[in-house]
Amino acid sequence: TTRFQISGILSTTEKNPSGPPPHQETARTARYIAHSSDWGHLATISTQDKVRHRLPFGNIFSVSDGPQDNGTGVIYFYVTPMDYTVSDLKSNPYASLTFSEAEGEFCRQMVYDPEDPRCARLTLTGKMVEVASEELGFAKQAMFSRHPVMAKWPVGHKWFFMKMELIQVWLQDWIGGVSLIPLEDYFKATPF
């Protein structure tokens, strides 16, 4: 299965099963990007005086949708109330999280600029909520298996787990427009 072929250059073939899926498989591509990404750009509406109240504000967060062998599509965060973005979320819990396939090797190998539509980007929009106690074990495993240093961060910063309850999945992975992926299709797809 080849993702695509341009100018005789092949990207991902059956010989490289860890590469991205074919671009036509939009739900699977979205899950692949969400699972492969270690960090993303979270955009909120700012409540901070230093950032002109009510303007968009973005911040980088380490994320995980589960351990390497168990991607769920649900994005988990480990955050502190000391972070401006977390303060923003208390006022307005809706946010957008953007990932770029440029984080991995694929776009570099294909010599795609991060803005090239063939270098896929995924934006998940939803409501940020604190992880409930019955889900804390999995959230911890998801985050600390992918970001082990986080488990040693200062307790005094009052770290806690959040997740994004998805409302919309937006994917651009090819020339000619974007795909809005139904949530059911997104969660049904596998990132592997």
Per-range role (PLM):
Residues 1-192:
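Binding-site signature for planar aromatic cofactors or substrates
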